[in-house]
Curated annotation (Swiss-Prot):
Lineage: Bacteria, Pseudomonadati, Pseudomonadota, Gammaproteobacteria, Pasteurellales
Coiled-coil features, chain-numbered ranges: none
Reactions the enzyme catalyzes: UDP-N-acetyl-alpha-D-muramate + L-alanine + ATP = UDP-N-acetyl-alpha-D-muramoyl-L-alanine + ADP + phosphate + H(+)
Pfam families xref list: Mur_ligase (PF01225), Mur_ligase_C (PF02875), Mur_ligase_M (PF08245)
Protein name according to UniProt: UDP-N-acetylmuramate--L-alanine ligase
Pathway(s) the chain acts in: Cell wall biogenesis; peptidoglycan biosynthesis
Encoding gene (name): murC
Domain of life: Bacteria
Gene Ontology cellular component terms for the protein in this record: cytoplasm
Annotated HAMAP family: MurC (MF_00046)
Enzyme category, top tier: ligase
Amino acid sequence: MKHSHEEIRKIIPEMRRVQQIHFIGIGGAGMSGIAEILLNEGYQISGSDIADGVVTQRLAQAGAKIYIGHAAEHIKGASVVVVSSAIKDDNPELVASKQKRIPVIQRAQMLAEIMRFRHGIAVAGTHGKTTTTAMISMIYTQAKLDPTFVNGGLVKSAGKNAHLGASRYLIAEADESDASFLHLQPMVSVVTNMEPDHMDTYEGDFEKMKATYVKFLHNLPFYGLAVMCADDPVLMELVPKVGRQVITYGFSEQADYRIEDYEQTGFQGHYTVFCPNNERINVLLNVPGKHNALNATAALAVAKEEGIANEAILEALADFQGAGRRFDQLGEFIRPNGKVRLVDDYGHHPTEVDVTIKAAREGWGDKRIVMIFQPHRYSRTRDLFDDFVQVLSLVDALIMLDVYAAGEAPIVGADSKSLCRSIRNLGKVDPILVSDTSQLGDVLDQIIQDGDLILAQGAGSVSKISRGLAESWKN
């Protein structure tokens, strides 16, 4: 059943005594989406960020009061303050909020409030969250269910990462990086996979991380549904502890929604899903890689379990253009040594880099892959150092940028120079360290060959750098 936006108030009560909501770090992907939803629900929104950008400009045009830089006076009039996990304790707006006894909450607590009166579908996991959330959102939109969605990245076909729908459905990416997904109380929870990442949150203890995921799944009501990947041995080990209905998906023979006959032609994937009722569904995807077949099958399983027709599911998946910065093709360019294709990808964990390389190899045949890699966080580089050395040795040519610190202090032996040294010692590829990114175009022109696929890889500023490169190459 759909409702007009005026009727939303009848099913989603107003937050009492809350007129103005202030966001510290409003430009972040997760923060901006929640701000946009609340703005469209009729709340006054203000927010600050260290830099202006497309996201902050869009929010300002929609009616939010945006400040660039942080100052105590920015919180004037706020009924509640929302902080992102990147905000430090000495932030002047955070300090002023506490002094004035204004409630300060995490981003996930506000997302939980938005979800409280809705039918929530939360997507968690180390990899694939953003794409899976986007796919489910598009299926529900295609089925004319007008869902609200809040994603950690751009939903390309919607042109934004958040949307206020006029129905009870809310589809959201659940963030395990700071364990804040424990605030959410969804009806359906998807877990795509689980690997050691953000281990500082879990005190370096993978068992603690597993226990936190089980706790997240226990937030489901007894009549809720957990959708979990059967290909992930860690998740399958947790299934007996979940205590809720569990549906599985994957390439595994044990999966309830089983993928068979996967083939990739160019950057297109097609395969068959065998469903629990012996139904067979043929799926076409316009995003490459087996990892995307898994993401799509998670979305298909949720939709089937919730009674959505096959036609809407298959149309949405065939039309799916990807999530922002997920194997984002920036174009083909003529360079002095020949024609190259440039792709931007957000993957910043060794497993994500590995599946991106595999998808590129499948679609690009025997052509060379040239990677521009920017490590993200010193702590991740330290914790997964050997895995990075192995996976970055799989490309044909490697340009390494300096570590994107994301606010962290440098860690000895976890910098780009150390990575390059270890990769060189392995002997499969000879990396080139480029600390001055203004030199990147010149360095590339010296090493690229006709037909190369250039992969700009990482979660930091490498996307902006690669897009700047694409712009300069167009001229």
